[in-house]
Amino acid sequence: MRRSGDWVRWLVLGSWVARRAARDPGVRELASNYVAGQEVGDAIKVASRLRRQGLRLGFSYLSADHDPEDTRMVMDELLERLQGASDGSEVAVKPSSLGLKESAGRAGEVLGELCATAERRGAHVTLEMQWPADYDDVIDLYRRVREDHPMLGITLPANLLRVETECRRLGAEGARVRLCVGSYPAGRAVSHVTEHDKALALVRCLRILMESRAYPMLATHDPRIIELAQELALRNGRGPESFEY
C-alpha cells in the first residue's frame, strides 16, 4: 500500500503547458505544485529530492503532440537517468501520446518497448484511459501489450457504466488497475452523471477489485473512500504490499 503521503505523482511538462506557464505567473505557480519541470533533468532533480524523503514517485508526460517516438524517447531518458531511483516508480502514458488513433500497431510497439525498458529499471507502466469513445481501442491495446508484459497497468474511470464488468474481468486476471472517478465527459447513456452516482460507482468498483486477485490503485482524495479502502483491505486480508492509494 502506498499512502497518499508517501506516493507523489510528478509530471514531465509538455509544450503547451510550458508555454502557458511562461506567460502566466499564476499558472506557473499552480503548476509548480504538480509539475516537475519542462525538461527531463528538472524531473530528475525533483525525484532525487523526494526519494531522499522516502517517497515513491509516479511520472506522466504532458505532451501536446501525438508522436509515439517522442513519448518513447522522453520516457526512456527519464528511466535511464533515474538510475536506482526508478525502482518501484511508475510511468503513466496516455493513448494519444502513443498515436493510438493514427496507428494501433505502432502504439502497441511503442508501449511494449516502454514496458520492457521500465521492467529492466524495476519500474511499472500504467496505460491511462482518455475519451469514452476510445474505450474499446484502449482496452484492446492494453490487452495486446499485457500478453507480453503482465505488469502493465490500466486506468479505469468508474463513471463509465461498463467499468464494473471490466473490473470483474481484470480482477479475475490479477491485473494492476488504477481506479478513478473519471474526468472525461460522457453521455448519460454510457455513464453516471451525478457526483453521488459517480461516488457510488467508484465504491462498487473498489469493492470488486479488493475482493479479487487484482492489485488495486485507488486514485482519490476523498477521505471517506480512502477509509473504506482501508476497511476493505482489512476485511479481505490484504497486506500493505497488495494495494495502494
Stretches with model-predicted labels:
Residues 1-245:
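Positively charged, amphipathic and often flexible ligand-engagement surfaces
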